[in-house]
A protein has these predicted regions:
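A short acidic (Asp/Glu
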Residues: 48-51, 75-78, 158
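N-terminal anchoring/stem segment of glycosyltransferases
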Residues: 1-63
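C-terminal catalytic/acceptor-binding lobe
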Residues: 3-21, 25, 125-223
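Conserved catalytic core of nucleotide-sugar-dependent glycosyltransferases
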Residues: 71-138
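Structural alpha-beta junctions
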Residues: 27-37, 84-87, 140-147
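Generic structural signal for helix capping and beta-alpha/helix-loop junctions
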Residues: 46, 96, 155-156
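Short beta-strand-to-loop acidic/aromatic patch adjacent to the donor-nucleotide binding site
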Residues: 61-74
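Short loop/turn segments at strand-loop or loop-helix junctions that form parts
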Residues: 5-12, 41, 69, 89-92, ...
Length: 223
């Protein structure tokens, strides 16, 4: 039986870029002799826990792999599998060759998932930013994490609103849920400026002061 890689198969796709990207991902998985384990999804956001549980159920070995839907596999992640660690993979941007600080693919041993990760999963939207904060920090807390470069490429495109904008509800939901998990487990918190809904007005006097100071400094330099 072939080793399986799970990712969301989104249909209908919200845009042509993603439609092409997920097809290229599927082809890259098959080119490495692996089997795509598709998680059927629509254009709406999906909870990360649902995707990972699907990946675990679909596992044909002692490990499972999950990745984002718009990367391209260039090497077989199962080649470095070991039962003692979760492995995270940073993407390389194409065509720039820049390495991304975030993690877009994970190889997870079934035993670590069953006995540890699955027992306390924060309620994160996949695609809503910072899911890698949990999947990286949770195994790191028990000394069971290692990161790698050189396994996945990512054709560059403009950032999505859900991934970076602090006013985006999916972004803010993920930050809240991650921080709740982090407090329970003694991990580092994500800090973002507090903003009023809709109008985006800052609720933090410290943030206001720092923003004012930066504007003042830029103004002084321009004189």
């Amino acid at each position: 039986m072939k080793l399986r890689v799970t990712f969301q198969w989104i249909e209908p796709c919200p845009n042509e870029r993603l439609r092409v990207a997920q097809q290229r991902l599927l082809e890259s998985i098959e080119a490495l002799g692996l089997e795509p384990a598709l998680f059927p999804a629509g254009p709406e956001m999906t909870k990360l826990a649902e995707i990972l549980r699907h990946a675990r159920r679909s596992s044909s070995s002692d490990y499972f792999v999950w990745c984002n839907s718009d990367v391209i596999l260039t090497r077989n992640p199962f080649a470095i599998a070991d039962r003692a660690k979760v492995h995270g993979f940073h993407r390389r941007e194409v065509p720039s060759g820049e390495l991304c600080g975030g993690v877009d693919m994970y190889l997870i041993p079934n035993v670590i998932w069953d006995n540890y990760l699955s027992r306390d999963i924060p309620d994160l939207w996949c695609g809503g930013s910072h899911v890698d904060w949990w999947l990286t920090r949770a195994p790191a807390l028990i000394g069971a994490y290692e990161s790698h470069n050189g396994f996945i490429d990512h054709p560059s495109h403009p950032e999505s609103g859900a991934s970076k904008r602090t006013s985006n509800p999916y972004f803010r939901h993920n930050v809240r849920e991650y921080n709740a998990w982090a407090r329970r487990n003694g991990a580092g918190l994500l800090e973002v400026p507090a903003r009023l809904p809709l109008i985006g007005a800052s609720m933090s006097p410290i943030t206001d002061y720092l923003s004012w100071a930066r504007r003042r400094l830029r103004g002084d330099r321009g004189q």
